[in-house]
Amino acid sequence: MIARILALAAPSAAVSAAQVLTQFAETLVAARLGTDALAAWSIALPFVLLLQQTSAGAMGGGVSSAIARALGANDHDQACALVKHALWIAFIAGLLFAIPLSFLLPWLFSRLAGDEIAHTHRFYPLAAFGLAAVPAWLVNTLSAVLRGGGQHRIVGRLMVIAWLVLCLLMPLCALVLELGLAGIGLAQALVFSVAAWLMWQKVRSGQAGFLPDLSIATQTALFKKILSVGLMACALALIANLTTFLVNARLAAYGTAHVAAYGIAARVEFLMVPVSFGVGAALTALVGHAVGAGQWPEARRIAWTGAGMAFLVTLPFGLWVALAPELLASFFTNDPEVREQAAHALSYLGWALPAFALGMTLYFASQGAGRMHGPMLAGFFRIAIAVGLGAFLAVQSELAASAYYVSVACAITVYGLIVALSVRPGVWSQANALGSLTNSSGRR
């Protein structure tokens, strides 16, 4: 079983490694632009992460799991038809990011960081969302189509190249060409557009294992197959990033340095998402195939094997972050106050990262199984603890900003535990099938 997971996880893990490297580079570039730029970038960060998470792991998981279940049930016609529906979802969702955020973020910059910072970085949202949102949705959706067909290697090759090119292009545009934060967004728009076109060439030529049927009329039932998992997963991504935004808003009362510092800590926290996705993308497909064939015990074994692998991989990193936070903080910023606060936040966060990675990996497995109620419950506990407990401790104790660092660490730990508890026979079984999945698959 480990060999099966590794065979599919290796390409996704390579993509995740390249993505983590690129995200580190993005954080470093933003920090090199100065504390004001880092503060603006930190305010936009939850929305940037939301864009990636909803298009890749969330709705992408819905696309991948729907296609995997169709192929697991030997319904190739349905898999062919699902591609058109997935592309419609991607295009509309991309516009829902591009248009509102191009205008909302400059206002948020002004409210949370000041008019001067908002004016200086006003073009960043236009580039990062106005130009990049639709291409990002398209490339991640087409990647999900290929993963649903088990073609992880094709996705791996293209996306590793894309992330590495982006890693080089961001500092070129932002620092060398002196475009500032807008250069980061412009680089993302260029890379995602080219990657989306290349990914479409793979899908349209049948390299997903089937030829997409774009002539078929759209069907509500096929949209539901994707959205029954994808919408709930998107809601979870929204909750996660709303948590980050609300904590950032609370920390704004303590000064710009605290906002910038938490941006660094939040980026490290969310690095667990692509790391978990490296294994989780394989689990979505493998679990989806097992569920499509009615093999629920096999699906649970696959999920827990993959989750254990993710936990063991992230444990050393989490311990290093917790025990040596100053080293990581100093890598991102030279500002003494920002560095001190970032190290303080990371010293709490590091202990929680392995449990968070475990929960995130099982979340991706839950997509393949169509079992999203456990992750959804975990998401609500996450925001309640991070924001609610943080506010309580900040008022009732002398922890001040540290209250939010502690509460965020507690929140992602509880998230992992709740998702883990949901992956059990009483939930993951044919008898407990979700109504939407039952109706779409014809099983009870």
Named regions from a protein language model:
Residues 37, 151-154, 180-181, 257-258, ...:
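Membrane-helix interface segments
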Residues 12, 16, 27-28, 45, ...:
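Transmembrane alpha-helix boundary and packing residues in multipass membrane permease domains
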Residues 32-33, 111-112, 149, 176, ...:
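Alpha-helical structural context
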Residues 60, 128-147, 155-166, 184-199, ...:
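Short runs within selected transmembrane alpha-helices of multi-pass transporters and secretion channels
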Residues 10-65, 129-136, 224-225, 230-289, ...:
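Transmembrane helix-bundle signature of multi-pass secondary active exporters and lipid flippases
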Residues 1-12, 67-132, 165-231, 287-352, ...:
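Short alpha-helical transmembrane segments in multi-pass integral membrane proteins
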